[in-house]
A protein has these predicted regions:
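Acidic/polar, glycine-enriched structural segments that form the non-catalytic walls/loops
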Residues: 1-73, 94, 98, 105-111, ...
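Helix-terminus loop motifs that line ligand-binding clefts
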Residues: 56-66, 76, 92-174
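Hydrophobic alpha-helical transmembrane segments
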Residues: 79-80
Length: 174
């Protein structure tokens, strides 16, 4: 397609798409300077680069640390994802926040909590939280990992009032 239409046309179409995407909801930015308003739109694009199409909100798309034998940050921490989902809700990006909550519904443990972090596909990721402490089995969780997802979901619901979206999540996530 690039050979047919030319790279300039493809770049223009791509820029037009993402410009429209970031501005699809009417948000009053009149109190802000033009430069700050542009930063608002650009920040949505930056957020989008960290969101997997399957709904996972990734901490960072890095991989260079793995060449030194370390772990990376291309994981979803549900706490961090919840805060980003709330920011997306405030920006009117309901589809991305919906996808995140669907992703969370697939990851939540049967007893209703989230573990430390997950891969973009929803599998349990490596963790530094112990499963045993002083010879006793413990859950390797942090309470805000679960509570912030529910808080962000509530903010999403009160903003968009999308009952049909929330209904299938009720039993699994809420």
């Amino acid at each position: 397609r690039v050979n047919e239409s030319g790279p300039d046309n493809m770049l223009h179409r791509t820029e037009s798409y993402w410009r429209l995407w970031a501005r699809k909801e009417p948000i009053d930015l009149s109190p802000l300077s033009a430069g700050v308003g542009e930063l608002f739109y650009r920040s949505q694009l930056v957020l989008r680069t960290q969101i997997d199409n399957g709904g996972a909100i990734i901490a960072a798309n890095d991989s260079d640390i793995t060449q030194f034998g370390g772990d990376h940050y291309s994981y979803c921490w549900t706490r961090d994802g919840a805060l980003v989902a709330y920011a997306l809700t405030l920006c009117g990006q309901s589809e991305l926040s919906r996808n995140y909550f669907r992703y969370c519904a697939e990851c939540v443990e049967p007893d209703g909590y989230f573990l430390h972090k997950y891969t973009p596909t929803g599998d349990l990721a490596s963790s530094w939280h112990p499963w045993m402490l002083d010879g006793l089995k413990i859950l390797p969780i942090q309470q805000d990992e679960t509570s912030l997802v529910l808080w962000a979901l509530r903010k999403h619901f009160t903003t968009f009032r999308d009952v049909e979206f929330i209904k299938p999540l009720f039993n699994s996530l809420i």
